[in-house]
UniProtKB/Swiss-Prot annotation:
Gene3D superfamilies: P-loop containing nucleotide triphosphate hydrolases (3.40.50.300). Transmembrane segments: none annotated. The keyword ATP-binding applies. One of its GO terms (cellular component) is ATP-binding cassette (ABC) transporter complex, substrate-binding subunit-containing. Belongs to the ABC transporter superfamily. One of its GO terms (biological process) is transmembrane transport. The keyword Repressor does not apply. Keywords: ATP-binding, Nucleotide-binding, Transport. Residues 2-216 form the ABC transporter domain. GO terms for molecular function: ATP binding; ATP hydrolysis activity. ATP binds at residues 34-41. Probably part of a binding-protein-dependent transport system YnjCD. Probably responsible for energy coupling to the transport system. This is Uncharacterized ABC transporter ATP-binding protein YnjD. It comes from Escherichia coli (strain K12).
Amino acid sequence: MLCVKNVSLRLPESRLLTNVNFTVDKGDIVTLMGPSGCGKSTLFSWMIGALAEQFSCTGELWLNEQRIDILPTAQRQIGILFQDALLFDQFSVGQNLLLALPATLKGNARRNAVNDALERSGLEGAFHQDPATLSGGQRARVALLRALLAQPKALLLDEPFSRLDVALRDNFRQWVFSEVRALAIPVVQVTHDLQDVPADSSVLDMAQWSENYNKLR
């Protein structure tokens, strides 16, 4: 379970978010909706431990009954998928994925884990492929595989579908939701598009917390 408790974010001269509270159970996907600038991505930055220095924050982040906002980023065990795939083009597809694997996985098990993931995503045989030769949809799949191979205990989706064309977007979206639900981890996504919201899942309007919301609409 992922719990955001009484979180407020502010700049020196203004408040951005006030008293954010929500909980995501294992296997559930909660969607945060609101216009650009209302604080969605800033909240994600705080959750992963990458909040810009100009912001101050109060509140707590809990994951599986452990408070994690006081931990370094690497120890929080939260994965994130961005709009851009952010692959390392100097490495092959397989090398990109190997970088994500936990150090506890050794020897041939590392290569096998990557090949299994590629096969599951329809990219069998792409281990040695140059990421620059991949289509947008393929790059997006590799980015998700990289996030999941790190074995996160929770996952954040920061509008990962927004730059895909309509045909790719629907298929990739359904594949993402299937993958994360199979892992039974809590997921939070931000989006502007109601079509990105899974059926029978919760949607939270940023208006209830954002100080800028009404100015941006």
